[in-house]
Amino acid sequence: MASSIVSSAAAATRSNVAQASMVAPFTGLKSAASFPVTKKNNNVDITSLASNGGRVRCMQVWPPINMKKYETLSYLPDLSDEQLLSEIEYLLKNGWVPCLEFETERGFVYRENNSSPGYYDGRYWTMWKLPMFGCTDATQVLAEVQEAKKAYPQAWVRIIGFDNVRQVQCISFIAYKPEGF
């Protein structure tokens, strides 16, 4: 019994020493109530969080029925000659080589022989003449578009801007779509 009293007394002195050397955590800090807390509230309407003053005017850009998506800017109405000239001038200003391509069957990506993308899925069109290396006049490119439209009135015609230094296609847009598309 004496041994049990001694051991319990020794344990008591050890715990007192440990308690005396412990420092209370967060001594001198402010309470947590003053810190900003981010809480996720699942029933908050997100439309009430941001406002631009009610000046939103939404425009449907892509009707999904009976409307194929072709290339860049295809969701817009057909470009006028002035708008085409503006796009061609942008292409030339960046130093890209204009190139015209046309497609007589389908002007959109399709997969007929295989479900995975490949060469025969409508991405590669027939080139109209040669790329216009050295061309600096947008009206010359537009004249070629008019000539391609006259030669193939039921074909899609697109203009490509090719960077011959990096050897990449930088811009591509539809210049002409046949009637009904």
From Swiss-Prot:
Transmembrane segments: none annotated. SUPFAM superfamilies: RuBisCO, small subunit (SSF55239). RuBisCO catalyzes two reactions: the carboxylation of D-ribulose 1,5-bisphosphate, the primary event in carbon dioxide fixation, as well as the oxidative fragmentation of the pentose substrate. Both reactions occur simultaneously and in competition at the same active site. Although the small subunit is not catalytic it is essential for maximal activity. Involved in antiviral defenses. GO terms for biological process: defense response to virus; photorespiration; reductive pentose-phosphate cycle. Residues 1-57 form a transit peptide. Keywords: Antiviral defense, Calvin cycle, Carbon dioxide fixation, Cell junction, Chloroplast, Host-virus interaction, Photorespiration, Photosynthesis, Plastid, Transit peptide. The keyword Chloroplast applies. (Microbial infection) Binds to tobamovirus movement protein; this interaction seems required for viral systemic movement. Heterohexadecamer of 8 large and 8 small subunits. One of its GO terms (cellular component) is chloroplast. It comes from the Eukaryota. GO terms for molecular function: ribulose-bisphosphate carboxylase activity. InterPro entries: RuBisCO_ssu, RuBisCO_ssu_dom, RuBisCO_ssu_N, RuBisCO_ssu_sf. This is Ribulose bisphosphate carboxylase small subunit, chloroplastic 1. CDD domains: RuBisCO_small. It is found in: Plastid, Chloroplast; Cell junction, Plasmodesma. It comes from Solanum lycopersicum (Tomato). Pfam families: RbcS, RuBisCO_small. Belongs to the RuBisCO small chain family. The keyword Transit peptide applies. The basic functional RuBisCO is composed of a large chain homodimer in a 'head-to-tail' conformation. In form I RuBisCO this homodimer is arranged in a barrel-like tetramer with the small subunits forming a tetrameric 'cap' on each end of the 'barrel'.
